[in-house]
């Protein structure tokens, strides 16, 4: 019987091929350097507008991955207000969008702060302010207490592709993850963000929103690596 990755004795001791990934990291660093150089060359107003556009696209695209289409103008307006950017055409934003923006900005603007259980719970509660995901009530602001499976197929003919860590082990697994996240400083930040994203998804600690929070964690490490929330 095939074991899931977290069932192996060496979990979560990740390994990788330095030769393969170093070439990729070199390309990433080159692109990062070009972008940072271009941003530094901009005037204050142009830089603020570029930052606003980049952050807005980040939020919108992240939600699109989950099949959710957010109103671009509402997202843009919410970010502009929170960052104190004066721009024309601000509109009111829904409570749901405000929560998503709040999480993203907390991750990218306060990236020097530790990632804690309390902080993750706050992000999760912000994503689901009503306690519902669509028409379904979910557990918010805490780890899931039920099982989590990735399933496809019609009712009665379901195929289970993946079953996440048992709910009673989520707290234990997350404690390991958070300890590593806050204390592992030897890894290249790009590699660390990749491992963090994968590790978090494997645990799948929440009823819903795990993917969006995983991408916020990745953004947090990216901002830390660049020394900027832009």
Predicted regions mapped to residue ranges:
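FIC/Doc superfamily catalytic core
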Residues: 1-230
